């Protein structure tokens, strides 16, 4: 029995060794469907991802000559073959010089083309006429569902072209931009996003752009499984305007808004957008819309407070901005206001924003 047992044990060891050798030999040709998809996404999309380094010009105590001092790094991606690069506004904010490094190591000076601080987006341009650029493939973020796989590619902590994989954890989140204006319809993901990933692409299983990684929620400053990305449909709408005009062409109502409005809403116990005054010659002025006025004794008299635009309730300036961003100059909207316990309606044609 001992002999037989040893014989069986030896046979098993021999079989395991052979199986291990076969497995090792075949591993390079084997991958699960998900692994194959990840590899394909990385190979196809990573050439579109760039490293962004920003620097400020400063004078030191020992020299009057300004020097470039590195401030930080982030990620971006190639938008088109003309050299336009998309990234986060906060990546290039206050930078005097921005360098863009392609995947092959070629580095270019970049110039700003347009920025949208309220959406934390910026467009840069590099002169790379003799270089074959690989633009990102735009996707439709409205098709995302919670549980769908997403892939982030970026340069966390300066480690270039790093890929992480996760799922869509939630949709329709709101986060603050650098201007404190709310960014709506934000994608939440558990794909690891760390400092340096900002401005990089969030991709779906087809390798299409579905978001721009912009923020993490983390007390430690590192990835904690809660990352946020600006939806691709917002990016697809804003970037062409930044390229053509240098800023978002959000139409205006022809009114000025009250600064620090939240304080006054609490003070006066009201909801809505407080009209400070109307722009001279504009349609709201002609129709009789009224802003704040001073009465006897220096008291401030409340004028029109916007509470609805078309069929959408308006509680604050974020609601107003979100409504107008989906409109175009020339469209007419119904503006519902409250004034002196009355409900008023104005039919107003939206105007193009004034030139800067």
Language model: regions and residue ranges:
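Bacterial N-terminal signal peptides
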Residues: 6-19
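Charged active-site motifs of nucleotide-sugar-dependent glycosyltransferases
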Residues: 271-274, 305
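Serine-dependent protease modules
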Residues: 22-270, 277-280, 298, 317-321, ...
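Short coil/loop linkers at secondary-structure junctions
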Residues: 270-271, 290
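Conserved PDZ fold ligand-binding element
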Residues: 85-86, 284-317
